[in-house]
From Swiss-Prot:
Keywords: Membrane, Mitochondrion, Mitochondrion inner membrane, Transit peptide. The gene is ATP25. Belongs to the ATP25 family. Its main location: mitochondrion. It is found in: Mitochondrion inner membrane. This is ATPase synthesis protein 25, mitochondrial.
Length: 703
């Protein structure tokens, strides 16, 4: 199934569809939940359970609510306030939970309603899948009106169902194919199906191999390499209903295949875990009805709501990702559409140069000014970047509506008024980026996205550099460096995904290592936060009261997002930049994702990249900081001898020796005492060698 799906990456439309599926299932902007049967998309052709009863109930109540809306609004408001005030005094152990309705088990077996002009086979097929095959939570998607047609074919109807187990999945898929062959003389194709006794034979072979090799951990692996928990049964082309569809008129067809009157039916059979991970209903529902994404009020309110100058309540600044990007890659070059002057254009006597004294040393720039901006605006942003942060924030005024309260604002809007429309939009986008990077409380990331949206709506040419600068700013952290429990808000990630989607529609390749690195970092914590119930996961030398902890479920959710991003990178054949490897290794290890840490560690030499001293130093320090004895023992036993086998070999110096000794103190806390007493242990020989190396380093430094 994966091999067929990956062929679509060669088409630009399929790349856009793949990005939409990533945005739907990556859990970056919303928590991953299993699709419930009561969800419906207004105006779309997504048919699910409970749509009939829920829609009638909501529609019948609409008239009575509208007739009494004006008269009952004050009373309802007062009643709501009184109720909330009274409920605030009720302790949690006295709160009544009987009002929470529980879904009836029989609702899982309800059949979805048939679409308009259904094929004759569809009703019997749904009945067989639900009753005989035993699949639950059936959902039916009518994709016949989708233009361009999906990769599975035109005039497509998709059925999605949940199996109870992997064994039930394979048995149901096999019986469905046999039923279609015997009753309808069709030739279905089932991708991912293991035939009769194939699953049992493969499991026996894997257990026998694990017993011979002594690797019992592979039996408990969730990804056994045998089944994916997903079977796609392509029923084939069947006869359509007696009525013609509304879109049956002749039109130019673009794509593969032909425009026939037959309908193709595909049955997606998944286990519960795979269905909640893939979110096929959310993907195809967003394609059928793009307006359904507008129904989510949480991220949209910050973008489409009131962005007046008086609103100063949402945003803080950003931290290190976008602000230090030019420092991490100082030699990076770009292609510009207009020449940039070698020296800043001289300002009038009343300029910011009077504020920045020549005698003061140059401060590190916290603003990456966009090279596409006009020369006057670029020079103003450069002058602003030389100011201290507090002074620069004062120069930005009171908010987006302020234009003349400070000297910088007067000069900026004066320069903007003399430019053409495209240059004005670029200058305003650069100004919004600078304001967000300076952590001004009145300038929010929603203002930055609004400037980008205005530029995109005007039809201006948006370069890849300008769009990526916007994405870096949106995916950057807001609080101070090393802030506890600091994460990028979901609304900001949603805005960045919209910018990336716009880039994809303009033909810009968004499947690159930098985008995935930013998404990895934005979905994680800014600094190391240990788990709340992980005993021994933290070094005993650190005061546990001074460290903020999080629940294990939070770290597991971050690990799930990182694993999905890694799978998408492997599917698109994308890899990270080598310069980002140390930060990725640290992020994986500190969030408890040790499998991805070692996978990336083992992948480095396979890419013909040597593991340097910095990587080994990082690994030993991370294990020493973790404080886990067993992991420290495995690290020392495996990788201290490996340092001499690297190409080129990693030589010991004083810094690396001290890191190894700190890791040995975690593996054996009494190793120094054992060395003095002459007791032989696993690492006493290595400890003595490290002591001799430290003495030689001190002697060499003294000379």
């Amino acid at each position: 199934m994966s091999g067929i799906a990956l062929q679509g990456f060669r088409c630009h439309a399929c790349r856009n569809a793949a990005f939409r599926s990533f945005a739907a299932i990556s859990s970056l902007s919303s928590s991953t939940r299993r699709p419930q049967s009561s969800i419906s998309y207004p105006g779309s052709k997504l048919y699910q359970r409970n749509v009939r009863t829920t829609g009638r109930r909501q529609f019948s109540a609409l008239g009575s609510v509208q007739s009494q809306a004006d008269s009952d609004l004050p009373t309802k408001t007062e009643t709501k306030e009184d109720t909330s005030a009274e409920s605030s005094h009720i302790p949690w152990y006295l709160q009544d939970e009987s009002h929470k309705p529980s879904s009836h088990p029989l609702k899982q077996q309800e059949l979805p309603p048939l679409p308009e002009n259904p094929p004759p086979i569809l009703e019997n097929l749904l009945q067989y899948i639900s009753v005989d095959a035993g699949l639950d939570d059936l959902a039916l998607l009518d994709l016949r009106g989708l233009d361009p047609p999906p990769a599975l074919g035109a005039n497509l109807i998709m059925i999605i169902g949940t199996a109870r187990s992997v064994k039930h999945l394979n048995v149901s898929g096999d019986r469905l194919c046999r039923w279609l062959r015997s009753n309808y003389q069709l030739r279905p194709v089932a991708d991912g199906l293991l035939g009769r006794n194939d699953l049992k034979i493969k499991l026996r072979r894997r257990a026998r191999k694990a017993k011979v090799t002594g690797d019992a951990s592979s039996l408990n692996s969730r990804d056994d390499g045998i089944t994916t928990g997903w079977i796609c049964v392509n029923v084939g082309d069947v006869e359509n209903g007696p009525l013609k569809t509304k879109n049956s008129r002749n039109r130019n067809f673009i794509g593969f295949g032909g425009t026939e009157d037959k309908v193709r039916i595909v049955v997606q059979m998944l286990v519960e875990e795979t269905r909640s991970e893939l979110q096929l209903e959310a993907l195809w529902g967003s394609l059928l009805n793009p307006e359904a994404g507008e129904m989510n009020p949480a991220p949209r309110d910050d973008v489409w709501g009131d962005l007046s100058s008086e609103t100063t309540s949402s945003g803080k600044g950003v931290d290190s990702i976008a602000s230090t990007f030019s420092q991490r890659f100082p030699g990076r070059r770009h292609i510009h559409t207009q020449a940039r002057p070698n020296t800043p254009e001289p300002l009038s006597h009343e300029t910011l140069g009077d504020i920045v004294q020549e005698s003061r040393p140059a401060l590190p720039s916290k603003i990456v000014s966009t090279s596409m901006a006009s020369p006057n605006v670029s020079s103003l942003l450069e002058q602003l970047s030389r100011l201290p942060e507090e002074e620069a924030r004062r120069e930005l005024g009171l908010g987006p509506g302020d234009r003349d309260s400070t000297l910088f604002l007067r000069l900026f809007y004066e320069a903007v008024s003399k430019s053409d429309t495209e240059t004005v939009l670029i200058d305003k986008l650069s100004f919004a980026r600078a304001a967000v990077l300076l952590k001004h409380p009145a300038y929010r990331k929603a203002d930055l996205y609004r400037a980008f949206k205005s530029m995109a709506a005007s039809g201006c040419s948006i370069s890849e550099e300008l769009a990526m600068d916007t994405v870096r700013t949106l995916l950057s952290f807001q609080g101070p460096e090393n802030a506890a429990n600091e994460r990028v808000p979901e609304q900001d990630i949603d805005l960045a995904l919209r910018v990336l989607e716009h880039m994809s529609l303009r033909g810009i390749n968004i499947f690159n290592g930098e985008v995935f690195f930013l998404l990895h970092k934005a979905s994680a914590f800014q600094s190391h936060v240990p788990a709340n119930d992980a005993p021994g996961a933290m070094n005993t030398s650190v005061n546990p009261d001074s460290v903020s902890k999080v629940q294990v479920e939070e770290l597991d959710r971050i690990t799930t997002v990182h694993n999905r991003l890694s799978k998408l990178m492997a599917s698109a054949n994308v890899d990270f930049d080598y310069k980002d490897y140390p930060e990725l290794l640290k992020m994986y290890f500190e969030h408890g994702n040790y499998s991805n840490f070692w996978r990336l560690w083992h992948r480095i030499p396979l890419m013909q990249i040597p593991r340097t001293k910095e990587l080994y130093l990082l690994m030993f320090r991370l294990h020493a900081k973790l404080g886990h004895q067993r992991q420290a023992v495995d690290c020392l036993s495996s990788w201290v001898p490996m340092m001499a086998r690297e190409q080129p070999p990693v030589a010991l110096d004083e810094e690396l020796t001290r890191a190894i000794m700190a890791c040995m103190l975690v593996a054996d806390p009494a190793i120094d005492q054992k060395t003095d007493d002459g007791t032989v242990s696993q690492f006493t020989r290595l400890w003595k060698q490290c002591l001799r190396d430290l003495e030689s380093f001190k002697a060499a430094n003294s000379q």
